[in-house]
Each structure stands twice: as C-alpha cells, then as structure tokens.
C-alpha cells in the first residue's frame, strides 16, 4: 500500500467539510446559523471549512452573500480551523476578483473550480489559473477538478506547470477515479496536497497518495471519517477498511440525487434547520428521504 500520504503536506488539515449554506424561512442566508454550524463541524472533528463551494450552493448565492458568509464563518471560527472560500468562476476576471476579496477577508485558502460551461482548452485553463494565482500570490489555492459538473477536466501536466506558482499547493480530485490521483502524483510528486472530493473514495484515494478529503458526509459522521483517515495513516488498514465499508450506504444516499439536496435533508433530520436548497434545486423526494431515515437510524444518528 502506498504510504505517500504520510510524506505529503496537508496544508488545510486532513478532514475538510464542504459546508452547506443555511437559509431561513424566507430563503435568505441565515448567517447566525452558518456560524453555529461551522463551529459544530469543527467540534465534531473538521480541520477546515469550505464555504461557498458546490455544497454551499455558490451558483445561487450573490457575490455579496458569499462575501458576508465568508466573513461570518472566518470571524466565528477565529483560529480554531482553516477556512477556505469557493472563488471559482467561468470568467477569469470574476474569479480573480473573488479570490482577492477572499484574501482580504482573511481566508486561509481558496477553492478554485475548473471553469464550467465554456469548456476552455488546456492552454486556457493554464492561463486562467495562473492569472488567479498571480493576482493573490499570498493566498494558498486548491484547484478543483469536477468534470461531471464543469464539462471539462484539467490535465495533470497543466497542474504540474502551474506549480511554479508558489501558492498552488493543493488539488481537490472529484473525477470519481483513483487514476487521477496517481497521475497527479506522477506529474507533481509529493509537493501537491491532493484531497479526495468524493467521500466514497477516501480510503482508495489515500492508498494512492491523497492526504485527506473535502467531505459532505462530515456534516454527519466527522468522527468516523477522522478515525478512518487516522487509522490508515497509522497503518491500521483493517480498521480503516471497516469504517470505509460501514459508511458506504450513507455515502451513496448523500449522492442519490444532486448534492446538496440529500445532506440538507439529513441535517434537518438531525435537528439543524438549514432550510431547503435554492431553486432550481428542490427538496429531497419522499422515497429518498425514507431511505435516508433508515440509514441515519442504522448509524444511530437519529
């Protein structure tokens, strides 16, 4: 088994939660609840919080809401945990503006997704990310590859070129395969901190060189995920495998439909009134909710 995760940096810790954005009964961002939820997630074991990412419904948040949400979480957590801001856009100029604002607001890093919809070629991706890195040179960046949502994928060779920017330090791998991690390791070595972007693949990705996970399930089972990662790093592979297998039904249910629909429903079930997603996303249907209740009950979460 590859122990390269032991040799790689983990600049944002091992377990990061891609936090949902709570909405009140009128559909407005509930900033007070966001602060409470962020602190709860850290109490449960999260080393870092990602705000305004995919799970945080960034496409339906205004720039003003995103900025206030980042400032709220940053101020609430203080030095208790790392705070990363989702600053990606399919417009380079907008991504630059958002990343600079994140740096000015005290973020510990920025999660910058591959541009979506306009499907730039690899040369365009290099220009895009290099411009962002150069615009906020002191802010550590986590590049984010999720081709199922963006329609294109950044190649490991381009990532390796971008590493001459000193603030390109990490990568969220959400292509759904361990091969992506292997190729990134081949091109970039151990200096790039690779995080799994898929809860179901945490253990497989750790085994080929990832250092941790940007998780959705950690809203619910952070201690279990923390233990899984620690068990792997300590060489307790049977224990890590047991946790991996035990949590698979939950992982599957949280992605039975578009994220963050299921995790918001799950949070409601365990007592967090985070509200439904904003349109065009909808609430979890009754059949999926019934299955989610069974899984949460089996894990003694409700």
Curated annotation (Swiss-Prot):
InterPro entries: Aldolase_TIM (IPR013785), DapA (IPR005263), DapA-like (IPR002220), Schiff_base-form_aldolases_AS (IPR020625), Schiff_base-form_aldolases_CS (IPR020624). It catalyses: L-aspartate 4-semialdehyde + pyruvate = (2S,4S)-4-hydroxy-2,3,4,5-tetrahydrodipicolinate + H2O + H(+). Belongs to the DapA family. It comes from Prochlorococcus marinus (strain NATL2A). The keyword Cytoplasm applies. Pathway: Amino-acid biosynthesis; L-lysine biosynthesis via DAP pathway; (S)-tetrahydrodipicolinate from L-aspartate: step 3/4. The record marks 54, 117 as: Part of a proton relay during catalysis. It comes from the Bacteria. One of its GO terms (biological process) is lysine biosynthetic process via diaminopimelate. It is found in: Cytoplasm. Its EC number is 4.3.3.7. Its main location: cytoplasm. This is 4-hydroxy-tetrahydrodipicolinate synthase. GO terms for cellular component: cytosol.
